[in-house]
């Protein structure tokens, strides 16, 4: 894999993730939950950075240990939004960046 600097693509990816979460239905149907589950599982494959890919796989796998079907992520809009905020903050923490307050995320991406 050719690593591309996350400063180039990271902000766009985060905006995509958070905007997807902001448009997620309050009460998703089973089909929408399946699509969201697939989206989350696909995230590591879309990252053009090997350490980012490794982190995403580990983060998602850790959730799947307790929740193999990711119900705790996809069963409601609030949980889906929270997943992406928590995921974003796990990356920020790993990189020594400031954490993203939920209130800031909600204002920026209009949750």
Curated annotation (Swiss-Prot):
Known catalytic reactions: 2 R'C(R)SH + O2 = R'C(R)S-S(R)CR' + H2O2
Disulfide bonds: 49-52
Annotated ranges, domain ERV/ALR sulfhydryl oxidase: 2-109
Keywords: Disulfide bond, FAD, Flavoprotein, Oxidoreductase
Signal peptide: none
EC class name: oxidoreductase
Cofactor(s) named in the record: FAD
Main function: FAD-dependent sulfhydryl oxidase that catalyzes disulfide bond formation.
Organism whose genome encodes this protein: Invertebrate iridescent virus 6 (IIV-6)
Family recorded in the similarity comment: Belongs to the IIV-6 347L family.
InterPro entries: ALR/ERV, ERV/ALR_sulphydryl_oxid_sf, ERV/ALR_sulphydryl_oxidase
GO MF terms, alphabetically ordered: flavin adenine dinucleotide binding; flavin-dependent sulfhydryl oxidase activity
Protein name: Putative FAD-linked sulfhydryl oxidase 347L
EC number per UniProt: 1.8.3.2
Record flagged with keyword Flavoprotein: yes
The keyword Lipid metabolism belongs to this UniProt entry's keyword annotation: no
Domain of life: Viruses
PROSITE patterns: ERV_ALR (PS51324)
């Amino acid at each position: 894999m050719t690593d591309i600097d996350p400063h180039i693509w990271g902000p766009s990816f985060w905006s995509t993730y958070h905007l997807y979460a902001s448009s997620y239905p309050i009460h998703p149907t089973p089909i929408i939950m399946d699509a969201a589950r697939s989206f989350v599982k696909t995230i590591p494959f879309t990252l053009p950075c090997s350490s980012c890919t490794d982190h995403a796989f580990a983060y998602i796998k850790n959730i799947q240990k307790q929740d193999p079907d990711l119900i705790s992520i996809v069963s409601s809009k609030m949980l889906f939004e929270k997943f992406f905020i928590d995921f974003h903050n796990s990356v920020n923490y790993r990189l020594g960046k400031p954490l993203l307050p939920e209130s800031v995320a909600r204002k920026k991406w209009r949750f």
